[in-house]
Amino acid sequence: MQLVTASEMQKIDTYTVNTIGMPQDVLIERAALSVIDVIGAGHFNLEHILVLAGLGNNGADGVAITRLLYAQGFNVSLQFVGNVSRAKESVQRQLAIIEKYGLVRSEKSDFNEATLIIDAIFGTGLNNLLPEGLQKMIKAANHIEKTVIAIDTPTGIDATTGEVRGAALKAHTTVTFGYNKIGLTRRVGGYLSGNVIVKDIGLLTPPDFSFSDTEENHSTKDV
């Protein structure tokens, strides 16, 4: 199976949206539906689902996932990590939709009440240390050992190197899109990603694209 770096994944995303013409919202909906499939096929405690959403496309996926769960009657809460007014347009569009469903996002949620946490804070675009406040929140969540499903990559994991950017949310399952990421197969990233499930959401590679690595060259114990 082919592996990609964060920058290679960005090239694939850009090509699919800008050259092929696939709307970003279509990819977001497909990503969200694929996560719903994973949740439905797994043996997760769905009594109270908490979705933690960031301000970028990963957060937009999280909002769409929240909407789909809410529409199916699940007890789901949506909490943003960061100032929503600074969120990308993709997030704002998803928010406008979910508000019409009547769901009110939470300003602050109690991790202890959640039986399942959806990590949609940062995906493959993370290239800096996480803010100190977010690091503290992640460490608190890890301490109480809640079941976490990470969207694309666990927050805090460098998708290229597998290194931790200050702190990382430990996932039971990671649903990643298009292709697996090198950082989910090596170093700490391989351990913190849990069970990695790759979902096809319709991303296309440019004609001149070449994969930098394959999964056979890595393992989760690679240090």
Swiss-Prot record:
PANTHER family referenced in this protein's UniProt entry, alphabetically: ENHANCER OF MRNA-DECAPPING PROTEIN 3 (PTHR13612:SF0)
InterPro entries: YjeF_N_dom (IPR004443), YjeF_N_dom_sf (IPR036652)
Cofactor dependence: K(+)
Record note on cofactor: Binds 1 potassium ion per subunit.
Coiled-coil regions listed in the entry: none
GO CC, alphabetical: P-body
Superkingdom of origin: Bacteria
PROSITE patterns, per database record: YJEF_N
Class of enzymatic activity (EC top level): isomerase
Keywords of this entry: Isomerase, Metal-binding, NAD, NADP, Nucleotide-binding, Potassium
Entry's family note: Belongs to the NnrE/AIBP family.
Binding site for (6S)-NADPHX: N57, N58, G59, A60, D61, G123, T124, G125, L126, N127, N128, L129, D152
Single biological process term from Gene Ontology: deadenylation-independent decapping of nuclear-transcribed mRNA
Protein name: NAD(P)H-hydrate epimerase
UniProt EC number: 5.1.99.6
Catalytic activity: (6R)-NADHX = (6S)-NADHX; (6R)-NADPHX = (6S)-NADPHX
Its job: Catalyzes the epimerization of the S- and R-forms of NAD(P)HX, a damaged form of NAD(P)H that is a result of enzymatic or heat-dependent hydration. This is a prerequisite for the S-specific NAD(P)H-hydrate dehydratase to allow the repair of both epimers of NAD(P)HX.
Binding site for K(+): N58, D119, T155
Any GO molecular function: NAD(P)HX epimerase activity
Residue span, YjeF N-terminal domain: 9-209
Organism in which the protein naturally occurs: Leuconostoc gelidum subsp. gasicomitatum (strain DSM 15947 / CCUG 46042 / CECT 5767 / JCM 12535 / LMG 18811 / NBRC 113245 / TB1-10) (Leuconostoc gasicomitatum)
